[in-house]
A protein has these predicted regions:
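Conserved ABC ATPase signature
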Residues: 27, 52-56, 60
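ABC ATPase nucleotide-binding domains
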Residues: 152-174
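Conserved ABC ATPase "signature" region
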Residues: 15, 30-48, 73
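A short, surface-exposed alpha-helical micro-motif characterized by mixed small hydrophobic
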Residues: 119-121
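Catalytic Walker B motif of ABC-type/P-loop ATPase nucleotide-binding domains
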Residues: 77-81
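Helical segment within the ABC ATPase nucleotide-binding domain
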Residues: 92-105
Length: 174
């Protein structure tokens, strides 16, 4: 989990996302304010903008870091294991948020996930790697197979299809 800067509010941290557009002599602009408000709105943090980071839950803090990245207004959002250290509720909340950012704002999301079921459920395209080499790439349900899981992770697994859950994997043995 990210270290928490002391004495910093949610809004101030998110404003750091605007640093690429500022200089030493330039004060924050209306465009900066709008970008920060948009990022806070996208991450459901408008009501927490004045809160100290230390007063937030782990899931809320993770959303603040995402809001900071969103404030940059780039077309691509890169996330490295965004659900690590979060409990199940906040994992799902965060993944639903990321999916909404992709669906509603057409952001390209590049995300590292180690939970195969999360990758199946929340990814449009996956790349599986082993020792720095791409082993499989494509649509999750086409490339995440028991053979690929055995090759990449050394794990025997079965896959099930459920009407409510969709496709999911159950690891069996090593």
């Amino acid at each position: 989990q990210n270290d928490i800067p002391q004495d910093l509010t949610v809004e101030k941290l998110v404003m750091f996302g605007r640093m690429p557009y500022s200089s030493l002599l330039k004060k924050k602009t209306e465009e900066d304010e709008e970008a920060v408000t948009w990022a806070l709105s996208c991450t459901n943090l408008l009501d927490k903008r004045e809160n100290d980071l230390s007063a937030l839950s782990g899931g809320e803090r993770q959303r603040v870091w995402i809001a900071m990245a969103l404030a940059q207004k780039s077309e691509i959002l890169c996330l490295d294991e965004p659900t690590t250290y979060l409990d199940i509720y906040y994992q799902l909340e965060l993944l639903e948020l990321v999916k909404a950012l992709n669906d509603k704002h057409h952001l390209t999301i590049v995300m590292v996930l180690h939970d195969i079921n999360q990758a199946i459920r929340y990814s449009d395209h996956v790349i599986l790697m082993k020792n720095g080499q791409i082993v499989a790439e494509g649509l999750p349900r086409e490339v995440i197979t028991k053979e690929v899981i055995k090759d990449v992770y050394g794990v025997n697994a079965v896959f099930h299809e459920d009407e409510q859950l969709g496709l999911y994997m159950m690891p069996l043995s090593i």
